[in-house]
Regions:
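Short, well-ordered alpha-helices that flank and scaffold nucleotide-derived cofactor binding pockets
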Residues: 82, 105, 131, 135
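Short phosphate-binding loop-to-helix
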Residues: 92-105
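Short alpha-helical
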Residues: 71, 98, 124
Length: 215
């Protein structure tokens, strides 16, 4: 039961807190309420879990909204703003966030080549920046159970399109486990456990029972 030495986190092929950045785009009331590809409450639950992972593991986070300053849209949902606190929000008029100068510069300023992306809708605000990032040599990891589209068909077609272009789909639980990787890395275990307890569904319930039994 001996763990191997930690691989170079900057060169690791898997996602690490040191080689990845998290991008969250357009989780606003209109977009959330128009999702028809999955249960909306579960969508919110999952993106909150993703955001908590980003904070807990110290990932650079680029957070963006669309059309708030123009008055055409509302700010991001309160559940996300509570987790992310006073993080800068890059508001845009572009549907493709990659074509917004400030957003684009913020992503490149992270100096991370692995981009974990969650955006609404899958068929627009996820697809377009994902394709552009891939074209520029980034690795793109769409969090498939924390994004949604205006229909199941639109969501699935969009994911196929970006996967065919080279994107690497990932689920939020897979993301959590990939960032943690080893229980011996004790500094992040408490947050890892708490995120599952708060947002991990039936698995979270089991962990909460186990945690209580050892309290």
């Amino acid at each position: 039961m001996t763990s191997q030495a930690v691989r170079d986190p900057l060169k690791d092929e898997l996602l690490t807190p040191q080689n990845a950045a998290l991008i969250i785009i357009d989780f606003q009331p209109v977009q959330v309420n128009s999702i028809a590809s999955m249960d909306r409450q579960m969508l919110v639950n999952n993106i909150v879990g993703v955001a908590k992972l980003g904070v807990a593991f110290g990932l650079p986070i680029v957070f963006s909204s669309v059309n708030v300053k123009t008055g055409l849209n509302k700010p991001p949902i309160a559940q996300l703003r509570k987790v992310l606190g006073n993080i800068t929000t890059y508001d845009r008029t572009t549907i493709n966030a990659w074509e917004d100068t400030e957003f684009n510069e913020a992503v490149k300023a992270t100096k991370r080549k692995k981009l974990i992306i969650a955006a609404l809708w899958t068929e627009a605000c996820l697809t377009y920046p994902a394709l552009d990032a891939l074209r520029e040599g980034y690795e793109v990891y769409p969090v498939v159970d924390a994004v949604g589209g205006t229909s199941v068909e639109a969501h699935q077609a969009a994911l196929r399109r970006i996967e065919q272009a080279g994107a690497k789909p990932i689920g939020w639980v897979q993301l959590a486990c990939e960032l943690q990787r080893d229980w011996i890395r004790k500094e992040t275990v408490p947050a890892f456990m708490d995120i599952f307890i708060e947002t991990g569904g039936t698995m979270g319930l089991q962990l909460s029972y186990d945690k209580d039994s050892h309290a």
